[in-house]
Curated annotation (Swiss-Prot):
Main location class: cytoplasm
Family annotation (InterPro entries): DsrC-like_C, DsrC-like_dom_sf, DsrC-like_N, DsrC/TusE
Kinase is among the record's keywords: no
The EC number(s) this enzyme carries: 2.8.1.-
UniProt protein name: Sulfurtransferase TusE
Family designation: Belongs to the DsrC/TusE family.
Known function: Part of a sulfur-relay system required for 2-thiolation of 5-methylaminomethyl-2-thiouridine (mnm(5)s(2)U) at tRNA wobble positions. Could accept sulfur from TusD.
Gene Ontology annotations of biological process type: tRNA wobble position uridine thiolation
Residues annotated as the enzyme's active site: C108
Length: 109
């Protein structure tokens, strides 16, 4: 759990929010800092993308799904694992969904 803006937010043992409705754009930099990431506009693009993906499909995208969906929307330049790993070095699907306040992708270890 973590304290943010005077309230306690429940997280699991790995730091994922237990309730995605606790998330806000103001909380994202705090979650990113815990991952050793300073959010830049390219990070925000991916974070907002995975949130939109979750809202549409009711699941957090695993890495293959994330790469494919990013390529469809943004093209090969951003829709490839090398680009995503530069932004999220410990795992784009895991770190982006955590920062976006979403559940851990099912196919992530």
């Amino acid at each position: 759990m973590l304290e943010f803006e005077g309230r306690i937010i429940d997280t699991d043992a790995q730091g994922y929010l237990k309730n995605s409705t606790d998330w806000s754009e103001a909380l994202a930099p705090v979650l990113a800092e815990q991952e050793g990431i300073t959010l830049t506009e390219p990070h925000w693009e991916v974070v907002r993308f995975v949130r939109a993906f979750y809202q549409e499909f009711n699941t957090s995208p695993a890495i293959r799904m994330l790469v494919k969906a990013m390529a469809q929307k943004y093209g090969e330049e951003k829709g490839n694992s090398r680009y995503l790993y530069r932004l999220f070095p410990k795992g784009p699907a895991k770190q982006a969904t955590k920062i976006a306040g979403l559940p851990k992708p099912v196919k992530c270890i």
